Amino acid sequence: MSSEYAKLVASLSNQDILTKWPEVTPLKKISGIPRSAGSDSSDSDLFDGHDEEQIRLMEELCIVLDYDDKPVGAGTKKLCHIMDNINAGLLHRAFSVFLFNEDGKLLLQQRADEKITFANMWTNTCCSHPLCVPSELGVDSSLEGSKDVNNLTNAVKGAKVAAQRKLEHELGIPFEDAPIENFTYLTRIHYKSPSGDESSKWGEHEIDYILILKTKNDITVNANYNEVRDFKYVSADELKVMFEDDSLVFTPWFKLICQSFLFKWWDNLDNLDQFKDEEIHRLL
């Protein structure tokens, strides 16, 4: 049975979302706008004590969605991650990369202390957001009147483009070590979580595209320490030991994915097709 929160999100029409959040730029008006909004000094108390580069990145434009993962428009990363907006039903698109080397070990990262949300937490290889631009929506031209943005194949294509970009940005993994054609899309996860305790001003509410990437052992990793505090390759057994260590904190989406899916995928890295689906798994 759907949670009350899921029912709230499902009840919001495209027009409801645009009315409730007038800061969201409708999809038909997006062509030609920059990849990020201009500097916004409102709610400056939200950023007190935070890193300037991470504040700048909060103006990137995420893909605002309806309950069925259909793009509605562009909203800043800040808008999409304010907990009051999340509690009112604002939803956006994300992706999570799980990179495995030839030995079947998973590359984990610990998020940097500078991060505004989920700082210092261990998580999967890379988790971020496609930008609300044609290439990361999976279409090649103007968005005005385009129905192509509602096509799952195109959305997956856009998520892979974004994943390649962010692997380079966060971990210094060059494009040639993470070619688009090597990403395997499996499914989508819908979840919500505050960043920290329930009193947090920040959080996540995403439909998360799961991407598996199998690479050689000798790929280049050159971490951007404004994004990543630490990284390591682990076996499944080593990850389970990490989960037993109370001194380590993990992102909520990573824990949810591990509890429901990851270890089944890990046991079948050479036979992932059996896990592919077009569902949105609601973990709300």
From Swiss-Prot:
A motif (Nudix box) lies at residues 128-172. The keyword Aminoacyl-tRNA synthetase does not apply. It is found in: Cytoplasm. One of its GO terms (molecular function) is isopentenyl-diphosphate delta-isomerase activity. It comes from the Eukaryota. Mg(2+) binds at H81, H92, E204, E206. The active site is at C127, E206. It catalyses: isopentenyl diphosphate = dimethylallyl diphosphate. Pfam families: NUDIX. Keywords: Cytoplasm, Isomerase, Isoprene biosynthesis, Lipid biosynthesis, Lipid metabolism, Magnesium, Metal-binding, Steroid biosynthesis. Residues 90-256 form the Nudix hydrolase domain. Its cofactor is Mg(2+). Its main location: cytoplasm. Belongs to the IPP isomerase type 1 family. This is Isopentenyl-diphosphate delta-isomerase. It comes from Candida albicans (strain SC5314 / ATCC MYA-2876).
